[in-house]
Amino acid sequence: VSTEEEYEFKFNREYKNFNPDGGDCANFASQIMYESGRFKKNSIWNYNNRDGTKAWVNAQGFKNYILNSGRGSLICKGSYEETYKESYNLRPGDFVAYEKGGRITHVSTVTGMDSKGYPLVTCHNTDRLLVPWDLGWSNKTIRFHLIRVHY
């Protein structure tokens, strides 16, 4: 069982649940990356003693770190209409960041594809397992950032 499946609806006790502090989405995405064994913690992206750095626990900080560190690259960003075709280039392990009012307010991890190749995501906050990446984000002002992770 993968990290995202095992800890989607029951949180991993090795990590703090950051929902009371504003959200757990970036913490969960960081756990998935770290538990994959392909990424080591560092001084900027780190979790220790029940606390995490901004890059580990904050959606905006997480997205900025992934892109600025070279651990990921932007596939595209924009409205749903501007990004849905490119979304078919997402692969399990990649991320979607959701921008509202000029700020990244949520991130989710691509964890599968439906029968037509449409990306499915898993995330915390509104806990979801294998749902379409755009589900619940129909507000026309939302901008999506599709991010390829370099594993």
Residue ranges and their predicted role:
Residues 23-32, 107-111, 122-123:
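Active-site scaffold segments
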